[in-house]
Amino acid sequence: VRRQRQMCIRDRYTAVDARDLPGMADVDSSLLLFCSEIRKYCTVALSGECADEIFGGYPWYRDPKIRATYGFPWAQSTKYRMSFLNEELAEQINGITYVDQRYQETLKQSDILCGRTKEERRLREMVNLNMKWFMQTLLDRKDRMSMYNSLEVRVPFCDMRIAEYMYSVPWEYKDYQGYEKGLLREAVKGLLPDEVLWRKKSPYPKTWHPKYRELVSKQMEELLAQGNEPLLQIVKKEKLQELLHEDRSIPWYGQLMNTPQTIAYLLQVNYWMKAYHVQIQV
């Protein structure tokens, strides 16, 4: 599916309408477009949400350095995100403390048996963190983007019987042959071609074309030039100006939201505030 530039802009804001909230920018809109194409041919589809959570597909399960990092592994930019808020809001919202409290609460809910090694305990915590937080975000995204197109998407890996069973499977089995979701790959061997079965995991697509960054940067420059947009009521203008020249390696959220997606997300926030008549009071 190929889209013209102006259509990409429209898709990004249509994704906000589908969520009723700002989301994951073009990561959302690409799924929205994908679902609209599928709907031309069928009304029901299957999707793999929850497989990464229960079979250990994410990089933060597999990379020891990321795994050992304190906090939600897909949200390591809380301090950076807080730096965008204007001073008045920042004084009222202690985002760093709030996120840390939710993180600690979730760790305490992890069901860990006595006698487990430090690594085994951490991997069990990671499963719980992903099931309770990251998976919920992806399920909501899939539901919103698909149903906006009247497409029913079913998620078989979310079946309670599978999820409960896999929760207790030791990591060395999930990590079969050192592959992401190795146990799942082995289970369906013979059902899929080997080039599909054993290919390296790839995250859901975002926009990689360099023109996309040019496009969203130009939109942000226009927003800053107008000076009266709702986004500027809550975000520091100078931080938005700095963002246009940044190239951060740590995502704003998840695995894919780097600088172009961060700019696009903030444009979504501005659109959402205008379209939904959002007013901020502190």
Model regions and ranges:
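ATP/NTP-dependent adenylation/nucleotidyl-transfer catalytic domains that generate, transfer
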Residues: 160-161, 217-222, 260
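A ubiquitous short alpha-helical element
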Residues: 130, 149-153, 225-229
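PAPS-dependent sulfotransferase catalytic core
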Residues: 192-254
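Core structural elements
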Residues: 130-138
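ATP-dependent adenylate-handling active sites, centered on carboxylate activation for C-N bond formation
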Residues: 3-6, 10-115, 119-126, 141-192, ...
